[in-house]
């Protein structure tokens, strides 16, 4: 490996003579080999033949020749980089040519799935891109995708490399391909303001304007970041300004992010100001109560437009006179000012020392850098450019910036936690833009004006998406339960026209009551940990007593230590990077596939502060494509606030210390005035709300209700056990609970639930891997010490016995009569979330299978058709008003006490499922998504778009499914609004629930479902076929989701539902005295094997292998209800 290591190093550093020398040994070796052929054949002459003859009979010479053999030109280092990767990334054109002449392959991917073409496109070197495409022994595939499903065109478009984009378009690169975040190259160019690239893509492919998703459009992305020219070009090209996504129209995005100029452009283009987002808010509603000056100006613009006036209040193009930044800091001590001047000087010295560096990849050129590029951070120039833009927003023209030949990649916006932790807002109210704005006064050099400064709002809190769940993150912008539920009241039960296709193959559905569903959260489903909902963000009663220490994320240190705090108070410089504006360091990931999963999901964390000489400190940024994470979500996303609230509680010491300062609130006001005056539109209200979470936890329930203006409900909450603010989180207090305790106003219920989302969730029992040592300590952690005696006297003396509790025992045995206390207990049981009717049946291990399976083959609603209820035991609580106490009043249903007695007498083994790889021979995964109990007693809810249904005249297995997917997808491309439904999956079938009013639309029995498959052209689209028992016709129902992982999980959950039904049937048949002669056969055919999408999967890995056209070669996955457990037969009901 010695010579190969030398070749890698020479290619990386561009040492052409070394590369040629090393590869000449390879040619020499090949010459000896050729002569050997002649010598061994007896006809070779000359030295070559002689050498070959000796080599064939002499082992020592053979060994000598092997020493002369050159290195493998396609060798790789620890990151999977070949010499060609290194040369392409670092722009060494001559080295690339030599490598290609020596048979270097262009189709070798590194560990992140990147090909040399990706790196050259990202670098912006059009010459190397041409070489890779047209030269070499292998044919470069221009549409090859990396692990993030990005093509070379994505890389070039994101960073504005117009020459590379031109070359790739000439080579017929597909511009409609989407990465893992469903972004096309046009989306990325619009997101980062790459105007020329946007024009080139639209000129080459005008149809890109119609290739939009419900998640975003190029217009939304450009409006969000204030790219005026890009917005204008898109509108001129014919993009619909009223196109709606989850966030509403582009006007919502521009207004929310304070882009006044874009708002004016959109209003002039005739954008409908009455469009509402998924929360039912118009753009005007979104900004009306925001406290920043810019938000008020935007609200005035929209109001003037609505009243038909031509704005006389139009925002003045020239910002109001700004006080000098030095004078704006009069409230800071002289010592602090001295520290700031010192920090500014050192920062500028550091900038000047690096002014000659070429771009954001300079660290990759250094000969001393390691081969593993994961650890490399880039330098200064990109951040310098972006901070120059921010300085412009402050009305100051930054100077000393040298022009660049190619546009730099956009600066990665600093996450809010980092910004607020690095610069204590009380004692260092300077942003990076303010620091740089002092530079002209120090250097006196000419300034450079730029047109746009789109990233000014990215310093505000909550502009990024933080997902703190596992790698299979489902990017649901909002949970279904967060939607407005007013429309659920008084529904007439009629099925909307757009859902009529779902009735094919559906069981009869009785009218559902007025109460909406509270759908179960699926085990694999996650919710973004962003900011609280808009309604909770705008409470005017939020006070200004928060601390200057920003609440850190879960992955960051919880509070500043005392030494750092002393440093702030005394004005003494500290070496910790948090106390200096120049150390805004971000996670580095140096190539297009370089972001790790945590980085991609937005859960960025800063490296632990290190003490370095200040001369070594640099503004660093991530080179990963994932810096768009901060730009793809707004501050109004639903929040899962548990971890954030927990970290807030850790800041109480720092809070108390800083609140002792008498000028604390006034200085916050001063800081907000400064930020507002420089036109950055920074909204501090959300940060204050997060910090105020600490104060909220110290309030009583009455004080908390008073803070949200609902103090009239204090007695109702207290009398029903909702008596502690620490235990009012979203996993305890739900809408049905508020109905039950007498809060009838839906607006008030929604307001209460929104406010409760900012409270911490009840921690699940054993959430940290350690169960409480005793029942008393567990109850004490829940604030329920009064029940200790009741638990112990009733035999619940260990944590294991507590885990087997259900609500019936809490009421009848333990006498926990208060609803809030019961909800608190059940919420702490991690494996059984309380989103079920009050009469929860025992866990599956406590129930005999045959007691359930008498209704397996019955229609889903058959047993309850006369009572007007659905037969699903555990659909969520909102469906029929808690089922009017369900089985307790159903004479046909056995009581839980009786079933528990049967279980004690005849204990059954817990249901065991075959793994997917055994249940389906071609399944690529090894485990199911859920516990069997989830599909038996509960339901798995998924949100999806319903594209429609199609009659299948000639059933050809999954081929019919895939054909229907393609046809329905094309037919709905131009639909402005696609209906949203919720799929509620159990072992009995699938229920379809209208997401807008939570009414059940249709039910498909498990026995009537077959041929579930993904669309091979769009893995977010899937479908299955049902059989209409009345007409014997087959219908294919087509759905789409916003995430490939979610689509995969839905199909896998359907497969698990078949497996559960199959195993239940087997156990029921075993338990009968006389076995049944035969059981009904159920078959479902999944798609061709679709490997589980991962961050590390390229598109080529997602493409199914070619197979024959028989049933098994279609990867049929059959869950067979058969008396023989080992039966391999598969009878189709089609």
From Swiss-Prot:
PROSITE patterns: ANK_REP_REGION (PS50297), ANK_REPEAT (PS50088), PID (PS01179), SAM_DOMAIN (PS50105)
Comp. bias intervals (Basic and acidic residues): 305-317, 382-392, 613-628, 1123-1134
UniProt entry tagged with the keyword Phosphoprotein: yes
Subcellular compartments: Cytoplasm; Cell projection
Gene3D superfamilies to which the protein is assigned, alphabetical: Ankyrin repeat-containing domain, Pleckstrin-homology domain (PH domain)/Phosphotyrosine-binding domain (PTB), Transcription Factor, Ets-1
GO biological process, alphabetically ordered: ephrin receptor signaling pathway; neuron remodeling; substrate-dependent cell migration
Gly residues: compositionally biased ranges: 33-55
Listed GO MF terms: ephrin receptor binding
Top-rank taxon: Eukaryota
Modified residues (Phosphoserine): 507, 620, 622, 624, 626, 628, 647, 661, 663, 666, 677, 887
Paired cysteines (S-S): none
Pfam families linked to this entry: Ank_2, PID, SAM_1
Quaternary structure and partners: Interacts (via SAM domain) with EPHA2 (via SAM domain). Interacts with EPHA8; EPHA8 kinase activity-independent but stimulated by EPHA8 ubiquitination. Interacts (via SAM domain) with EPHA6 (via SAM domain).
Protein name from the UniProt record: Ankyrin repeat and SAM domain-containing protein 1A
Species classification: Eukaryota, Metazoa, Chordata, Craniata, Vertebrata
Gene: ANKS1A
